[in-house]
Amino acid sequence: MEMLKKAILKALEDKYNAQISEADATLKIYLEQSVGIGEHPQHIDEVDKLIEKIATAEEKLEVLKGYDD
């Protein structure tokens, strides 16, 4: 049972870290290479959504730590 718990927690940790990496990479494109995304009038809204994704995933990682014995 302990191995299953660890496997689930590790899978969730990997998932949240991947979400952070994906949002961070996209955010860097918006902030550093905006020519790469073409005409897009809602840059601020999109950047805000990406920051929200990062914050949510980071918060989930913190909660996850409480279940790692």
Language-model features: locations:
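Extended, charge-rich alpha-helical interface modules
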Residues: 2-69
